[in-house]
Amino acid sequence: MGLALAFESSCDETGVALVENGRRVIAAPLFSQIAMHRPYGGIVPEYASRAHLEKFTPLLSEILTAHNLKPGDLDYVAVTTRPGLIGALLVGYQSARACARFFKAPLIGVHHLEAHLAAVRLSGHETPFPALGLMLSGGNSAIYELKKPGDIRVMGDTLDDAAGEALDKAAQILGLGYPGGPRIEERAEAFALSRGITPGHENNLDSENIFPVILKSLRRDKVEFSFSGIKTALLRAYESAAEKNIDALAFFYQERIVEHITRNLSHALEIAGKKPVIAAGGVLANKRLRRSLEGICRKFGVQLLIPEFRYCTDNAAMVAAAAQLYFENNLKSPYSDVQSGNAFLSA
C-alpha cells in the first residue's frame, strides 16, 4: 500500500493529487496557466509562481474536504523538486512540506522527468526495468537508460532546443499562437486531409518535403537531438515564400521533427539492445509521433509504453507514481532539496 498526497508546480501547471499505491488516482485537481501566459507567447516565471501560490490552497482544500483526511492517514507526501522554474518549485515544495508535517508523513522529493516516465503506472503498467526512456517536453528531449528504481542514466540529450520548444517557436514563426504543439498538429492534419493522406501514410508526401533532414549523418557511438537547424529552415522558408501555405509548412515541419525523434530512438535501440521503451512528456500528445514510435518499436520487437493523454502533460498524479517506486523499494530519494538543474542522481 501507499496512500500519497502529491504536488506538482515545476512550470505552468498547478497540481495536487491523492493517489493510492502509486497507481490508482483517487483525485487529481489541476489548474492550467496556459490562458494566462498565452498573451506573452510563452511562460513568464514570476506570473507562474504567483499563480501557484494562489491556486494550491483551493486545490488542496478540494481534496481534503472530499476525502476527510486526518493526521496518520497518509503514508507519504510527494513533491517535484527539480528541474523547473525555481520560484514555482519552491511554492510547491513549501506546500508539500507543510502538509507532510501536518499529516505526520515523510516527504519524498521527485525528479520531474522520472515522474513523467513513471506516469505509465497510472494506466496499470509496471515500469519494466531495465528499459529505455524517451523524454519529450517543452524543456527536455533526451533518451535515458532506466537500470532499476532510482537509477536512471542519460544516454543522449539535445544539443540545443527541446522538441516542445521547437514546436512552440515554429508556431510563433507561423503566427499560430501558444502553445505551439497542438497548433502545429492541427494545421498539419488539415494539410494531410486536403491532400487525401490518411493517418499512417504521411510518408507518401516525403518527396515534397522542403526541409532538410536533421543531422542526417548521426554519430554511431552516441544519441543526439538537435532542432535548431530545422527551426531556422522554417523561418527562411516562411520569409521567402511569396504565398505562405501555413498548413503545408506545419505539415512538413512536423514530419521532420517526428523523423528525427524516431531515428534517434532506433539508434538508441541499436546501441542499448532490445529493451522496452517508455515514451513520456507533453510532446507525446502528438498523434503523428505516437504512430511513428509504435512503428519503430514493432520493427525492433519491443514493448512501447506511453501514458494516457491526460497524464502526458504535467500533473501531480505522476509525481506520486514516481515516489511510490522509492516507497515500495525502501529507497531514499536523492531529490530532497529544490534545484533547477536536471541531473539524475542515484538512490
Model-derived features: positions:
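Conserved phosphate-binding catalytic cores of ATP/NTP-utilizing and phosphoryl-transfer enzymes
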Residues: 1-2, 109-131, 322
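N-terminal beta-alpha supersecondary unit
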Residues: 2-73, 79-83, 112, 116
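Short beta-strand scaffold segments in enzyme catalytic cores
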Residues: 14-19, 133-135, 141-145
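Short Gly/Thr/Asp-enriched flexible loops that form oxyanion-binding sites at enzyme active sites
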Residues: 79-104, 287-295
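Conserved phosphate-binding/catalytic loops in two-lobed NTP-binding clefts
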Residues: 109-110, 294-319
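Glycine-rich phosphate-binding/hydrolytic loop that grips phosphoryl groups
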Residues: 116, 307-347
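Glycine-rich phosphate-binding loop plus the immediately following alpha-helix
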Residues: 125, 148-189, 232, 236-242
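A contiguous, well-structured pocket-lining segment that forms one wall/lid of small-molecule binding clefts
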Residues: 187-193, 204-277, 286-300, 327-330, ...
